[in-house]
Amino acid sequence: MRLFHKIGLGLSLGAALVAGVASAQQQQFINVLTGGQSGVYYPMGVALSQIYGKAIPNVRSTAQVTKASAENLNLLQAGRGELAMSLADAVSDAWRGNAEAGFNTKLDKLRGLSATYNNYIQIVASADSGIKTMADLKGKRVSVGAAKSGTELNARAIFKAAGLAYTDLAKVEYLPFGESVELMKNRQLDATLQSAGLGVASIRDLATAVKIVVVPVPADMVAKVGDPAYQPAVIPANTYTGQTADVATAAIPNFLITHSGVSDEMAYQMAKQMYENIDTLYAAHNAAKSIKRENAVKGMPVPLHPGAERYYKEVGLIK
């Protein structure tokens, strides 16, 4: 009897172990590459990871803090993430292998999942700095975003269009949004350029602590960038405390990018569950409210992932 009991127990344990191994083998991971915690990418990435963890069977999903666009795309190419947020111009630079933008080789594994919302070039100066125009930045202390981040690439493009170089500034800091704001609060910086969705937390924080001026980027200056990804736009009045008038600027689209190593089924589910649970994204940040499925494939700088393509065909977005 004891022998049969031991055999039965052994078989049960063996079955449990096999089931456990099978379960572990079935579990898949989605690492969502975002940006700094004070930007828009991070809360959106957290929302996406929550959607995927709940809606896709046997999936564990996390949101990773990064330096945003350029780092995200390089991590995707290396297979160190399944989904990333990036600015359109950074995606184009990565696909071409633009070394000056931080891409030492062509990132040929990148695949598109969806367009999202627009980033707005938001140049904010302290009111007592005397800065009111782009030309006034000359001789001032300015943060241009983390080195080789999407924001910093935008800063280079906008400064060049304005006839400015970093050497024209008294001091250049390569800092994430939150750190830039802290230095401005402490009067160690005069201005910060942040490429983000409207109402970004870092600038809202700054505007409640010190009087600010939102510096305009006129439409003719946007045209001088010479990149169709940059379009004239407006930061509406009262987006930030003390900003009482509309301010002209440039807008650049954001995209969700994956890579060719992600299975067709997983890419299909990532696109599908994002749009079937879009209210979760809308609740994460106001900027996300401009994400619409009908715009999902517009202006995609890289080939669409076959899994995402399957979903968009299924819903009649593409033929």
Segment roles from a protein language model:
Residues M1-L11:
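Bacterial N-terminal signal peptides that target proteins for export
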Residues V18-A24:
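Sec/Tat signal peptide C-region and signal peptidase I cleavage site
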Residues N31-A55, V59-R60, N119-N186, D279, ...:
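Bilobed "Venus flytrap"/periplasmic-binding protein-like clamshell domains
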Residues A88-A90, A99-E100, S129, A165-I257, ...:
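Pocket-lining segment of extracytoplasmic ligand-binding domains
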